[in-house]
């Protein structure tokens, strides 16, 4: 078990947070967990799917499962650029990269409390939509300051969502993204799902060979979109949480 202190969450959610990261071979140790979480208010545990010892042990000690994280990947050479749905959007979609703080703020202002309705902070009654939004805004701002690429999806001349791109060697990592609330449930998830490949391709990042990102099991609409494009599931992790006030 790896113990990860999360000091940034004090600003994001107002609680001292620790994350317990398990491997598939770890055996649950109650004494070890009690020692690790001392002094923290919000406890998060990530357990590889199949490690029942840690899953049941955490649950018996008051942790509650809130989601499963699905780690997807896709090799660009395996992506179908001639897909029929992509052809329907051809000429209607473009990407606009945020280059300065003013453009970052414009994107932050378009984000609304119910935009991230499948996020675990949003869904947790202790936190709720407003805290979830605050956390996402802080997260995106910090990513932007660290040099992560931030861009919007422009559909028929209107910004309908955003995504991020953190290119590490040949891999496009996608920390976060979403469709703006007013454009949800309109079939535009296809734009978000394909952007992980199309953005680096169309913007000239020739060294990028694949993409990788995590999606919550609570987000069924996007899971359907990624499955439609045959993204590969590389990993699954149970995510459990506990409040200690």
What are these regions (language model features)?
Residues 22-23, 45-53, 180, 211-223, ...:
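Conserved beta-strand-loop-alpha-helix junction that forms the acyl-donor binding cleft
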Residues 53-54, 127-150:
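Active-site rim helix/loop that mediates acceptor-substrate recognition in acyltransferases
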Residues 1-13, 75-102:
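Conserved N-terminal entry element of GNAT/NAT acetyltransferase domains
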Residues 47, 147-163:
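Conserved beta-hairpin
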Residues 50-65, 217-235:
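Conserved active-site alpha-helix within GNAT-family acetyltransferase domains
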Residues 24, 92-119:
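A short beta-loop-alpha structural element at the N-terminal edge
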Residues 26-36, 179, 185-202, 224, ...:
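Conserved acetyl-CoA-binding loop-helix of GNAT-fold acetyltransferases
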Residues 38-48, 171, 200-215:
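Conserved GNAT acetyl-CoA-binding A-motif
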